[in-house]
From Swiss-Prot:
Mg(2+) 4 binds at residues 832, 834. Residues 402-546 are annotated as: Oligomerization domain. The keyword Amino-acid biosynthesis applies. It comes from the Bacteria. The keyword Zinc-finger does not apply. This is Carbamoyl phosphate synthase large chain. It catalyses: hydrogencarbonate + L-glutamine + 2 ATP + H2O = carbamoyl phosphate + L-glutamate + 2 ADP + phosphate + 2 H(+). GO terms for biological process: 'de novo' UMP biosynthetic process; glutamine metabolic process; L-arginine biosynthetic process. Mn(2+) 3 binds at residues 820, 832. Large subunit of the glutamine-dependent carbamoyl phosphate synthetase (CPSase). CPSase catalyzes the formation of carbamoyl phosphate from the ammonia moiety of glutamine, carbonate, and phosphate donated by ATP, constituting the first step of 2 biosynthetic pathways, one leading to arginine and/or urea and the other to pyrimidine nucleotides. It comes from Staphylococcus aureus (strain MRSA252). Residues 1-401 are annotated as: Carboxyphosphate synthetic domain.
Length: 1057
C-alpha cells in the first residue's frame, strides 16, 4: 500500500517532562518518529513541554512548540497550524490522554484533524478497563476475575466476593499511578480512594491477585493490511505483582517451552488484531508455572518503555516503523534499516541474552518505602547483552552505579542469615543481592523459590555464579578458571577479590595472556542476513566482529541510567557532541548502557558499544579501537568519575585536562585559584571527622551547609543549624564518600544565579545568565530558573560576566563549564563550579539558538570560538522570558519528604516561554502539573522564622479573592495585619487540617519546615497528604510568591476605596 497523499501536515504530541513511569524512552520514540515522517515527505509539527530532549530540537521537526501539554494549549496550536492529522501514540500516556481529550471536546472534529495510527475506539478499548474486559470475554481470552469500581463502597462489595489479595489498577494512568496490592481493609480503602483520584475517568479495575504467575510480555507490530509480527518477547524474573518497569527483565524469555511460547504468541496477535492496532503495541500476560493456564493482564496500544527496550534488544526500530505504518505503509514494503536487505515483516531473532535492571532512586531517598508492587518506582534502567544469562546479568548489575559490582552487597558478610531471609521474603529493589548472599550461606534454592516464586531456572543461574566464586577462591591465579569466570561475565574487580589480588594485577594478567573480549554485532537476524549495523556488545569468545577502521576516532562516554540528578539533559549533550565529532571528520564512538535514550540508537554514532560504564569495560574498548582520546564532559558525573581511572592507563582525556577537572573539585586547590583571580566564595573549611567539623562550624558560625566533595545532584547535602544536627550529619554522611572529606561552608542567603559558559582556552562565551526564583539553599535542579534575569542590576550582571570569564580561564576550561553564584547583601560569591556539561545546557541551547554542546565539542577538537563567529562575554539576549520549572514524582514514592533543600529531588523539567515573566511562569507551572486557579482556598502553616514574610503573600491572595485557612500560629500573625483566616486544627485535633486537605477543601498548601521531632513529623504528614491528594504543596516561600504573582496577573484585585 502506498503512503497516504491526502495529508500533508502531521502534529506529533510528545510525552512532556520525565517522571517515574515516563522517562527518556519517549524522547527516543518521538525523535525517531518525527524523522521517519519527514523522510516520507510530511511536514511535522511537534509539541512537547520538555526542553531537555533531542526531539524538541529545530532539526527534528519542521516546527517545534515547547508549550504545556494541556488541552487548552494544544487546541491553540491546532487552530493556529491547522494540521491535517495528529499522531498520538508516541507521547506515552500523556500523548494518548491528550488525544482522547481533544477528540471528546470536539477540537479535532472542528478543525478537521484526523487521528493517525491506531483508531481512537481501539485506544479506548485497550485503556478503558470495562471495555477491555468485555472484548476479552468476546474473544474467549481469559482475564483475572475482576470488577470495575467508581467508588470505595463498590470496592468493598467486590472484596466480599473474592477476598484478598486484590490488585487495584486505575484507568488511563501510566506507571501504575495510584495503584497497588491490598491485603486488608485499610489498604483497600487507601489505595482505591487514591486510585480514583489519579484516574482521569475516576475508574479503577479491581482484580483477584494472580501474584506468583510468570509475567511475560510480547512486543508486537501490526499494519493496516493485518500483517502482524512479534518483535521480541520478554520474561520478568519477578513474578506477577511487581510493575514491569520495576522488574528485572530478560529477553528472549528463558523458561517457556515451545508450546507455551507459541500459545502466548498466538494470543498476543489475536488480541492486537481484534483491537485493530496499527503500529507498535505491548501485551502483558500472566502464565501459571504449573499448567497451561494464562491470563491477559493488559495491552498498551502505544509505544512504551518496553518497546524502547525491545528496539535496543533486537535492533528493530519500532517507533520509526510505527510512524510509517500510521501513514499507510505496510511491514512487507518497508526495509529493516538494520540489515538494509530484509523486510520489516521478518521477525527478529536473537543469538544473545539481554538483561534489563531498573535503576531506583533510593540512594537519594533513603527513607523512601522500598517495597515494590504495581506502582512503578524506578527512574530509569540499564540493559546489558551477553552470550549467557549470567554474563548479561552481571554486566547489567555493574552498569547500575550503586557501588555494587556483583551478585551481592558490599557489606554482605555483616548481615545475619535471618535478616537476609527476612529481606528476601519482601519484594524490594535489593532482593536480587540478598538472594546471592543467601546462596553463599548455603540456603537451598527450594527455600528461596518458596519465598520469592522466582523460577528455578534463574535460581540455578544465580547458584552457578556463586559456584564460580568458590572455584576462583580454590584456584587462585589459575588462568583456566580466570577465563571460565570471564565467560560468565565476572568483572576483574570480583575476580581480584577471590584471587586475593588487586584489580590492576588481574587486568595485567589478562593482558599478558591475551584474555580479552571480542565484540559481536547486534543485527536482528542472528547473522542470517548480511548486516552492517555498527552496534556491538563485548563477550569472551573467539571471533571479533567489530572491524577497526583507520580513521581517527573520538570516544564519547554516555551518562548511564536516568536517575535523580542525572537526567536526559546529559544524553542530549552526548548526542550533540557526537554530531559535532562527525561533522569535523572523525569517527564517533559512543559507550553507554541505557536502553531508553537517543544516544543508544545505532543510527546516531559511527559505532555504538552497549557496555557498562566501568573502568574495565571502557578500557577493553579503548584497547581495541585506540581512539585519539576520550570525551568525559558530556556524560554527567558517571563519565567525569572515570576520567582519573582511564588517565592512569595512559588514555588521553580530551577537553579540560584531568588536572583542571580535579582543581575544580579539590577544595584547597580551588581556594588557591579563587584567591589568585580574586573571586570571593562563602567562608568554608574541610573536615574529615565529627570533631573537626564542630570546630569549623564554631569558627564560621551557624547556619552552615555541609556536603561531601565529588557528588552530583546535591547528594547527602544539608543545611544545619546547631552542633547536634552537625554531629548527626557527620556520623551519617561521611558514609556518602569515605575517600573524600566533608565541606563545611557558611550558608549565605540571597539570590542564586546559574551561568553556563563555553571556553576554547582563549575566548569565553556566555550564552545566558539564569536567575533562580528560590533563594540559595534549594538545589539548582529543583529551582525555577528564569532567563533573562529579572531583578539584577547592571553592576551585578557585569560582575557575574567578569567572574565567569576569570573562572573559565583560570581553570583552563576547554569545553563547557557551569557555575552557581549567590548574590548576598554584600556582593557576588561563587558557590560551585562544575567543569562539564550541565542540566541547563539543553534549555539555554533552545532559547538562544547557540548549539552549546556542539560548540564545546568543536572547541575540544581545537577550533576557535572567534572563527565560529562568537565574541567574548554574554551573548545577545533572546526575546521574551523563559522559565525552567522542575517536575517531581512524589506521588509515586511513599515516605519521601517533599521539602525543597540542597539535595535534588526532581525527576524532570518543563519550559515556559512568553512575553512576560508572569505568563512564562503560568506556562511553566501549568506544564509541571500545578493547576493555577484564579480563586480557591489556600492553607498556610509556616515556621516561626517565615511568619513575617508570609504576611505579604497572604495579603495578595486575600485581595484576589482566595480564602485562607491557617494553623493557629500563622493565623494569629495574619490577624495582626487584619488579614482574615479561618483557623484549622493541628493534626488529630478538631477540624483537623489533614481532613480538610483530604476532603478537597484546599487548592494550594504553603508549608515551610520547622525543625524538631514532633513538628517535623507533623509537617511531613501534611506534605505527604497534600501530594497524595494531588494538591500543589509549596515548601519555599519564593515559589509561593511566584505563584501568587501569576494568580494576581490573571485576575483583578478588589480593594475598597
Amino acid at each position: 500500500m502506498p503512503k497516504r497523499n491526502d495529508i500533508k501536515t502531521i502534529l506529533v504530541i510528545g510525552s512532556g517532562p520525565i517522571i517515574i513511569g515516563q522517562a527518556a524512552e519517549f524522547d527516543y520514540a518521538g525523535t525517531q518518529a518525527c524523522l521517519a515522517l519527514k523522510e516520507e515527505g510530511y511536514r511535522v509539527i511537534l509539541v512537547n513541554s520538555n526542553p531537555a530532549t533531542i526531539m524538541t530540537d529545530k532539526e527534528i521537526a519542521d516546527k517545534v512548540y515547547i508549550e504545556p501539554l494541556t488541552h487548552n494549549f494544544i487546541a491553540r496550536i491546532i487552530r493556529k497550524e491547522q494540521p491535517d492529522a495528529l499522531l498520538p501514540t508516541l507521547g506515552g500516556q500523556t500523548g494518548l490522554n491528550m488525544a482522547i481529550q481533544l477528540h471528546e471536546s470536539g477540537v479535532l472534529q472542528d478543525n478537521n484533524v484526523q487521528l493517525l495510527g491506531t483508531e481512537l475506539t481501539s485506544i479506548q478499548q485497550a485503556e478503558d478497563r470495562e471495555m477491555f474486559r468485555t472484548l476479552m470475554n468476546d474473544l474467549n481470552v481469559p482475564v483475572p476475575e475482576s470488577d470495575i469500581v467508581n467508588t470505595v463502597e463498590q470496592a468493598f462489595k467486590f472484596k466480599e466476593q473474592v477476598g484478598y489479595p486484590l490488585i487495584v489498577r486505575p484507568a488511563f494512568t501510566m506507571g501504575g499511578t495510584g495503584g497497588g496490592i491490598c491485603h486488608n481493609d485499610e489498604e483497600l480503602h487507601e489505595i482505591v480512594s487514591n486510585g480514583l483520584h489519579y484516574s482521569p475517568a475516576t475508574q479503577c479495575l479491581l482484580e483477584k491477585s494472580i501474584a506468583g504467575f510468570k509475567e511475560i510480555e510480547y512486543e508486537v507490530m501490526r499494519d493496516k493490511n493485518d500483517n502482524a509480527i512479534v518483535v521480541c518477547n520478554m520474561e520478568n524474573i519477578d513474578p506477577v505483582g511487581i510493575h514491569t518497569g520495576d522488574s528485572i527483565v530478560v529477553a528472549p524469555s528463558q523458561t517457556l517451552s515451545d508450546v507455551e511460547y507459541q500459545m502466548l504468541r498466538d494470543v498476543s496477535l489475536k488480541v492486537i488484531r481484534a483491537l485493530g492496532i496499527e503500529g507498535g503495541c505491548n501485551v502483558q500476560l500472566a502464565l501459571d508455572p504449573h499448567s497451561f493456564d494464562y491470563y491477559i493482564i493488559e495491552v498498551n496500544p502505544r509505544v512504551s518503555r518496553s518497546s524502547a527496550l525491545a528496539s535496543k534488544a533486537t535492533g528493530y526500530p519500532i517507533a520509526k516503523l510505527a510512524a510509517k505504518i500510521a501513514v499507510g505503509l505496510t511491514l512487507d514494503e518497508m526495509l529493516n534499516p538494520i540489515t538494509g536487505t530484509s523486510y520489516a515483516a521478518f521477525e527478529p531473532t536473537l543469538d544473545y541474552v539481554i538483561s534489563k535492571i531498573p535503576r531506583f532512586p533510593f540512594d537519594k531517598f533513603e527513607k523512601g518505602e522500598r517495597e515494590l508492587g504495581t506502582q512503578m518506582k524506578a527512574t530509569g534502567e540499564v540493559m546489558a547483552i551477553g552470550r549467557t544469562y549470567e554474563e548479561s546479568l552481571l554486566k547489567a548489575i555493574r552498569s547500575l552505579e550503586y557501588g555494587v559490582h556483583h551478585l551481592g552487597l558490599p557489606n554482605g558478610e555483616s548481615f545475619d542469615l535471618d535478616y537476609i531471609k527476612e529481606r528476601i521474603s519482601h519484594q524490594d529493589d535489593e532482593r536480587l543481592f540478598f538472594i546471592g548472599e543467601a546462596i553463599r550461606r548455603g540456603t537451598t534454592l527450594e527455600e528461596i523459590h518458596n519465598m520469592t516464586q522466582i523460577d528455578y531456572f534463574f535460581l540455578h543461574k544465580f547458584q552457578n555464579i556463586i559456584d564460580i566464586e568458590h572455584q576462583l577462591k580454590e584456584h587462585q591465579g589459575d588462568l583456566e578458571y580466570l577465563k571460565y569466570a570471564k565467560d560468565y561475565g565476572f568483572s576483574d574487580k570480583t575476580i581480584a577479590h577471590r584471587f586475593n589480588m588487586t584489580e590492576e594485577e588481574v587486568y595485567q594478567l589478562r593482558m599478558e595472556n591475551d584474555i580479552k573480549p571480542v565484540y559481536k554485532m547486534v543485527d536482528t537476524c542472528a547473522a542470517e542476513f548480511e548486516s552492517s549495523t555498527p552496534y556491538y556488545y563485548g563477550t569472551y569468545e573467539t571471533e571479533n566482529e567489530s572491524i577497526v577502521t583507520d580513521k581517527e576516532k573520538i570516544l564519547v562516554l554516555g551518562s548511564g541510567p536516568i536517575r535523580i540528578g542525572q537526567g536526559v539533559e546529559f544524553d542530549y549533550a552526548t548526542v550533540h557532541a557526537v554530531w559535532a565529532i562527525q561533522k569535523a571528520g572523525y569517527e564517533a564512538i559512543i559507550v553507554n548502557n541505557n536502553p531508553e535514550t537517543v544516544s543508544t540508537d545505532f543510527s546516531i554514532s559511527d559505532k555504538l558499544y552497549f557496555e557498562p560504564l566501568t573502568e574495565e569495560d571502557v578500557m577493553n574498548i579503548i584497547n581495541l579501537e585506540k581512539p585519539k582520546g576520550v570525551v568525559v564532559q558530556f556524560g554527567g558525573q558517571t563519565a567525569i568519575n572515570l576520567a582519573d581511572k582511564l588517565a592512569k592507563h595512559g588514555v588521553k582525556i580530551l577537553g579540560t585536562s584531568l588536572e583542571n577537572l580535579n582543581r575544580a573539585e579539590d577544595r584547597k586547590e580551588f581556594e588557591a585559584l579563587l584567591r589568585k583571580i580574586n573571586v570571593p566564595q562563602p567562608q568554608g573549611k574541610t573536615a574529615t571527622s565529627p570533631e573537626e567539623a564542630l570546630a569549623n562550624a564554631a569558627e564560621i558560625g551557624y547556619p552552615v551547609v555541609v556536603r561531601p566533595s565529588y557528588v552530583l545532584g546535591g547528594r547527602a547535602m544539608e543545611i544545619v543549624d546547631n552542633d547536634k544536627e552537625l554531629e548527626n550529619y557527620m556520623t551519617q554522611a561521611v558514609k556518602a564518600s569515605p575517600e573524600h572529606p566533608v565541606l563545611v561552608d557558611r550558608y549565605l542567603t540571597g539570590k542564586e544565579i546559574e551561568v553556563d559558559a563555553i571556553c576554547d582556552g582563549e575566548t569565553v562565551i556566555i550564552p545566558g545568565i539564569m536567575e533562580h526564583i528560590e533563594r540559595a539553599g534549594v538545589h539548582s535542579g529543583d529551582s525555577i530558573a528564569v532567563y533573562p534575569p529579572q531583578t539584577l542590576t547592571e553592576d551585578e550582571l557585569a560582575t557575574l560576566e567578569d567572574y565567569t570569564i576569570k573562572l573559565a580561564k583560570g581553570l583552563n576550561i576547554i569545553g563547557l563549564i557551569n557555575i552557581q553564584f549567590v548574590i548576598a547583601h554584600d556582593g557576588v560569591y561563587v558557590l560551585e563550579v562544575n567543569p562539564r556539561s550541565s542540566r541547563t545546557v539543553p534549555f539555554l541551547s533552545k532559547i538562544t539558538d547557540i548549539p552549546m554542546a556542539q560548540l564545546a565539542m568543536r572547541a575540544i577538537i581545537g577550533e576557535k570560538l572567534t572563527d565560529m563567529g562568537y565574541q567574548e562575554g554574554v551573548q545577545p539576549y533572546a526575546e521574551g522570558v523563559f522559565v525552567k520549572a522542575p517536575v517531581f514524582s512524589f506521588n509515586k514514592l511513599k515516605n519521601v519528604d517533599i521539602t525543597l533543600g540542597p539535595e535534588m529531588k526532581s525527576t524532570g523539567e518543563v519550559m515556559g516561554k512568553d512575553t512576560t515573566l508572569e505568563k512564562a511562569l503560568f506556562k511553566g507551572l501549568t506544564g509541571s502539573g500545578v493547576e493555577v486557579k484564579d480563586h480557591g482556598t489556600v492553607l498556610m502553616t509556616v515556621s516561626d522564622k517565615d511568619k513575617e514574610e508570609v504576611v505579604k503573600l497572604a495579603q495578595c491572595l486575600n485581595e484576589v479573592g482566595y480564602k485562607i485557612l491557617a494553623t493557629s500560629g500563622t493565623a494569629n500573625k495574619l490577624a495582626e495585619y487584619d488579614i482574615p483566616a479561618e483557623v484549622v486544627g493541628k493534626i488529630g485535633g478538631e477540624n483537623d487540617l489533614l481532613t480538610r486537605i483530604q476532603n478537597g477543601d484546599v487548592q494550594i498548601v504553603i508549608n515551610t519546615m520547622t525543625k524538631g521531632k514532633e513538628v517535623e513529623r507533623d509537617g511531613f504528614q501534611i506534605r505527604r497528604t497534600t501530594v497524595e491528594n494531588g494538591i500543589p504543596c509549596l515548601t519555599s516561600l519564593d515559589t509561593a510568591n511566584a505563584l501568587t504573582n501569576v494568580i494576581e496577573s490573571m485576575t483583578f484585585t478588589m480593594r475598597q476605596m
